[in-house]
Amino acid sequence: MTLVLNQTEQLTSGLKAMGVKLAEVQQAKILRYLELLHKWNKAYNLTAVRDPVLHVSRHILDSLAALPYLKGVQFLDVGAGAGLPGIPLSIALPESHWTLLDSNGKKTRFMDQCRMDMGLPNLRVEHTRIEAFSPDVKFDGIISRAFATIGDMIAGCRDLILSETRIYALKGLYPHDEIEAMPADFEVVEWHKLEVPGCDGERHLLIIARSGNTGGS
């Protein structure tokens, strides 16, 4: 079985198991992303997952697991790395707008190449550190699956977090210690245990907001 056929079947069955419906053109873009990731990863070490057969479950389905819980139009992916979860989510939500931020030049060049190659007009890439980032838009949601801790994420993004902004933190095991160490002016307003086909181990999504701003969550 060729790699492309393997990934296509994994993607189709995984989306069905998760109840995520994507048009053929959206699935084609995701498969093209996987092709680019496999190609660039050989030279630039974009992801520690070296086996491309695992990229569908570990990267694509894992990213899309957050899809049912996202609310808003403007999103920021902090520490986007190889474009995860931002690129899969921007493909799945073409009416939304995504800013993908990373301080690693190789990774932002890869994300820019994906944006141009795949035709993703709702995507912009920023090569900078979060502390130096001065956006010209207000974000409804700030998401990350790679930022060190929830506390670090809040500290870095604090100036961007408005009363209505939601932080979406994708984690493995439920991070009890990180939650206990969160700043007092923030709280977990929702949390969800995620089921990701093909992924071993637990996955959780935590939705965090400024304390006292839980309406509409």
UniProtKB/Swiss-Prot annotation:
UniProt: S-adenosyl-L-methionine binding residues: G79, L84, I130, E131, R145
Superkingdom, natural source: Bacteria
- Does the record bear Nucleotide-binding in its keywords? no
Extract one GO molecular function annotation from the record.
rRNA (guanine-N7-)-methyltransferase activity
Location of the protein in the cell: Cytoplasm
Keyword field: Cytoplasm, Methyltransferase, rRNA processing, S-adenosyl-L-methionine, Transferase
GO CC terms: cytosol
Q: Which family does it belong to?
A: Belongs to the methyltransferase superfamily. RNA methyltransferase RsmG family.
User: What HAMAP family does this protein's entry cite?
Assistant: 16SrRNA_methyltr_G
Summarizing the function annotation, the protein's role is: Specifically methylates the N7 position of guanine in position 527 of 16S rRNA.
What name does the UniProt record give this protein?
Ribosomal RNA small subunit methyltransferase G
Which organism is this entry from?
Hahella chejuensis (strain KCTC 2396)
Tell me the name of the encoding gene: rsmG
